[in-house]
Amino acid sequence: MAKGTPRRNWSREETILAYELYCRTSFGRIHSRNPEIIELANLIGRTSGSVALKMSNLARFDPELQKRNITAMPHGSKMDGIVFEEFSKDWQELSYQAQIIRAQLQNKEVAEIVDLADIESIPPGEYRERMMKTRVGQYFFRKSVLNSYGNRCCITGINKADLLIASHIKPWAVSDEHTERTNPSNGLCLNALHDRAFDKGLITLDGQYRIIISDRSRDVEMDKETAAWFWKYDKQCIVLPDKFLPGKSFIEYHNDVVFQR
């Protein structure tokens, strides 16, 4: 910033964009060299360093960091707290509002930014907007969950993105659309096989984040090598994310309702 140039306060819209990107970015990648941070900085006319700093400021409101005694940047604006408080209770709205703001700044439609080409054929109206919100929320959920786990399966460590799924702990169909469906704490990063097993209740987690395999899995036909590989993770702790720890209430729901005992 040139000497004598007045400091420009962050607007609500800019703060929403920074918070949405914060949610989609692992802590180790919150720095001025991150291409996505550079892209956002260019979009809003700021330096990548200032965007990275804003994201670090937002981290101080994260209750999970506070529980784990992880120190975030101690300073920030009142707007940071307002945005964090508002949208940490409505993840779907955070993801959607951020894409609306981004689209307006780029003079584009939301469908162009998040690759929603198949929705463009739906006539404008309430149904189309609801579909767009859902798809944008799914995009946000996947990015947030996978990045929180470092793009690795939390059970096996597989790190091929094409083989990874952002799995819902409490199933999407029965989750609240505002507080649960796109809440990254309702997600696990799993490979396709373990995602399916988790979805069908053949595996679950306990309160200590240990993997519990259902005895019903023994009825599944598989060769000895596959069985040994599948069962070796029983009672092992998952690799925990650097933020958005799996919510205990979501795990309890999966234990009680989904898991096959």
Describe each model-derived feature in a short phrase.
Residues 46-61:
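Major-groove recognition helix of helix-turn-helix-like DNA-binding domains
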Residues 166-169:
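Histidine-centered catalytic micro-motifs used for acid/base chemistry in nuclease
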Residues 36-41:
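Short alpha-helical "recognition helix" segments of helix-turn-helix
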Residues 171-261:
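A detector for short metal-coordination/catalytic motifs
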